[in-house]
Amino acid sequence: MEDLYGILGVDHNASVDEIRRAYRRLARELHPDINPDSADRFKAVTHAYNILSDPEQRQRYDRHVSGGFSSDFNLSDLFQSFFDTSAEFQRGSDLLVNIDIDLKTAIYGGSQVVKIDSLVVCDVCNGTRSEPGYKAEVCFDCNGSGVVRGEVRTTLGNLITQNTCSKCRGNGERIDHPCRRCYGNGSRSAPRDITINIPPGVETGMRIKIPNMGNAGGAMPGDLYVDCKVKEHPYFLRDGQDLYCRLDISLVDALLGTKVKIDSLDGELAVVIPALSQNRDVIRIANKGAVTLRGGKGDLCIVLNVLLMQKLDPEHRALLKKIMPNPPKPKLAKRTSGFFSWLKNKFT
């Protein structure tokens, strides 16, 4: 077990004021908004301060360290009593932002920069809440602990209550000369550019969590949540793992077959159109579809749309009758459902 006094760099007989000054110095140095790599150290410093600045909890800790507790004493209860009452004060609030993502980025991943307004550590007072040249004093109401304890009589006995100090709002300090930039809050609203890393396979309705990029708080910042909406693409449609597109071809190419190049989301792609292709035939190209979050990849489904000639001159009409002297007569066809009905709804 690490020594709480050692974490703050103070002696075991340090006064509350010395503990507070040591904490404020370390908090300015290790705050995640200023030094993101020191988040764990900052959390440890904050935990140590909140226990040692509370006379009752400090006494319990000192007794345990000196061996004054029975063997069934659990030190984690001491820490838990702190976490349960002040975790909300320790952490900044979360933020939520909505972004529109193009289909290619949603399928293959990428990054996107968004602008947000969030609370950041004040750049004038560095979170101390006091004007430069001044320092905070210990709050008289809570003696610097940030919490006020009381006793309530009940039929079951006396209950000890613990509430956030209303005078210092849980900070344990009295600010006589509040910072003019942040009005004594220690943080202020400011615009920020945040780069969102989008994993492959994102779909509309999915939420991305970015830890410690929310509002600044008394200790750790909150998290940033990003709600994703995938924009419609003018040519491609995603359905599960598969991508669909429609390819217009001439009657000649449908009858004789051909080879064409199309610009897919994955780059230029050569497509072979078989001879005697029918309208709404589907050419399926494996592993050229959408990527999923679990790493699978679907197919690219190319739906053929055969374009008939809008006009026939007498020469072409005579030629067609010569090629097909006995075409099949029109007749009713059985109604179909399922796949082709779905295609009709999607592409007509």
UniProtKB/Swiss-Prot annotation:
Any one GO MF annotation of this record: unfolded protein binding
Q: What does this protein do?
A: Participates actively in the response to hyperosmotic and heat shock by preventing the aggregation of stress-denatured proteins and by disaggregating proteins, also in an autonomous, DnaK-independent fashion. Unfolded proteins bind initially to DnaJ; upon interaction with the DnaJ-bound protein, DnaK hydrolyzes its bound ATP, resulting in the formation of a stable complex. GrpE releases ADP from DnaK; ATP binding to DnaK triggers the release of the substrate protein, thus completing the reaction cycle.
Zinc finger motifs (CR-type), residue ranges = 109-191
Q: Where does the record say this protein resides?
A: Cytoplasm
Recorded domain comment: The J domain is necessary and sufficient to stimulate DnaK ATPase activity. Zinc center 1 plays an important role in the autonomous, DnaK-independent chaperone activity of DnaJ. Zinc center 2 is essential for interaction with DnaK and for DnaJ activity.
What is the species listed in this Swiss-Prot or TrEMBL entry? Tropheryma whipplei (strain Twist) (Whipple's bacillus)
Q: What name has this protein been given in UniProt? A: Chaperone protein DnaJ
Q: Does the keyword NAD apply?
A: no
Q: Which residues bind Zn(2+) 2?
A: 139, 142, 165, 168
PROSITE patterns for the chain = DNAJ_1 (PS00636), DNAJ_2 (PS50076), ZF_CR (PS51188)
Annotated Gene Ontology cellular components are:
cytoplasm
Q: Which residues bind Zn(2+) 1?
A: 122, 125, 179, 182
Q: Which family does the UniProt entry place this protein in? A: Belongs to the DnaJ family.
**Entry keyword set:** Chaperone, Cytoplasm, DNA replication, Metal-binding, Repeat, Stress response, Zinc, Zinc-finger
Co-factor remark: Binds 2 Zn(2+) ions per monomer.
CXXCXGXG motif repeats at which positions? Answer: 122-129, 139-146, 165-172, 179-186
GO biological process annotations for this chain's record? chaperone cofactor-dependent protein refolding; DNA replication; protein refolding; response to heat
Domain called J: residue spans: 3-65
